[in-house]
């Protein structure tokens, strides 16, 4: 499970991959993938970093752990592979996007178009056992993803951090650079969306901020396939 990034994350993370905690994560995962069903496929664990280079990040949307159903997770937070039913949280994200910016609700949940525009779709835990939510939350992934958030915080160019739900909001402590813009609300899950996610307008707020610093806005419309 050696990782090779064909972008600037390679240099930024090479020392992290040599640390003792990460070697333990890797050893644990080798055994987990050998003996259990683990999501996403091991080739997709780092998709968020493969698709969105450090220098290109303009927005971060933090998720918790990958979807734990068959064929869903592919390494981008909230996104599912084409041809898979759209999960309830993403349905609510699409509903808010429709209300906020007038985007139509597409027929799939594959969000790579966002990643290609500089939206880092990062889960705080990068793997999960099939059918067992949060099952890999304590194996060391959070040390790794906290480090990524700190690297992003260190960047000179401003970034929008979108934090949905308590797990994501707990990472606000790493975002200390005042030039970054933080948008936070309850999680888009059906359990909480009506308590402050709907109507929070995160997408238009993001674009307004990007335009205010002379950046191109994100085209949030995911087209039908």
Swiss-Prot record:
Question: What GO CC annotations are associated with the protein?
Answer: cytoplasm
Checking InterPro entries in the record gives: UDG_fam1, Ura-DNA_Glyclase_AS, Uracil-DNA_glycosylase-like, Uracil-DNA_glycosylase-like_sf
Reaction equation(s) it catalyzes: Hydrolyzes single-stranded DNA or mismatched double-stranded DNA and polynucleotides, releasing free uracil
Keyword DNA repair assigned to the entry: answer is yes
Q: Which SMART domains match?
A: UDG, UreE_C
Class in the EC hierarchy, top level: hydrolase
Q: Which GO terms describe its molecular function?
A: uracil DNA N-glycosylase activity
Would the keyword ATP-binding be found if you checked this record's keyword annotation? no
Where does it localize?
A: Cytoplasm
GO process terms (BP) = base-excision repair, AP site formation via deaminated base removal
Disulfide topology = none
Keywords for this protein: Cytoplasm, DNA damage, DNA repair, Hydrolase
Give the EC number(s) under which this enzyme is classified.
3.2.2.27
What Gene3D superfamilies does this protein's entry cite?
Answer: Uracil-DNA glycosylase-like domain
Q: What does this protein do?
A: Excises uracil residues from the DNA which can arise as a result of misincorporation of dUMP residues by DNA polymerase or due to deamination of cytosine.
Q: Which family does it belong to?
A: Belongs to the uracil-DNA glycosylase (UDG) superfamily. UNG family.
NCBIfam families under this entry?
PRK05254.1-1, PRK05254.1-2, PRK05254.1-4, PRK05254.1-5, ung
What HAMAP family does the database record attribute to this sequence? UDG (MF_00148)
Q: What is this protein called?
A: Uracil-DNA glycosylase
List the top taxonomic levels of the source. Bacteria, Bacillati, Bacillota, Clostridia, Peptostreptococcales
Gene symbol of the encoding locus? ung
């Amino acid at each position: 499970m050696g990782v090779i990034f064909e972008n600037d994350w390679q240099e930024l993370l090479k020392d992290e991959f040599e640390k003792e905690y990460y070697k333990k994560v890797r050893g644990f995962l080798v055994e987990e993938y050998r003996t259990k069903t683990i999501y996403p496929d091991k080739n997709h664990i780092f998709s968020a970093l493969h698709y969105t280079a450090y220098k290109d990040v303009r927005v971060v949307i933090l998720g918790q752990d990958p979807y734990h159903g068959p064929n869903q997770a592919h390494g981008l937070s909230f996104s599912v592979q084409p041809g898979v039913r759209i999960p309830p949280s993403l349905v609510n994200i699409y509903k808010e996007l429709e209300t906020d910016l007038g985007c139509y609700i597409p027929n799939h949940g594959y969000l790579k178009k966002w990643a290609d525009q500089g939206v880092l779709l990062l889960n705080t835990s990068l793997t999960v056992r099939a059918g067992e939510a949060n099952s890999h939350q304590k194996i060391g992934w959070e040390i790794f993803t906290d480090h990524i958030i700190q690297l992003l915080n260190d960047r000179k160019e401003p970034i929008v951090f979108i934090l949905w739900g308590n797990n994501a909001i707990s990472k606000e402590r790493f975002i200390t650079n005042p030039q970054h813009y933080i948008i936070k609300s309850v999680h888009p899950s059906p359990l909480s969306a009506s308590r402050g996610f709907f109507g929070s307008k995160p997408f238009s707020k993001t674009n307004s901020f990007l335009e205010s610093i002379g950046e191109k806005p994100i085209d949030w419309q995911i087209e039908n396939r």
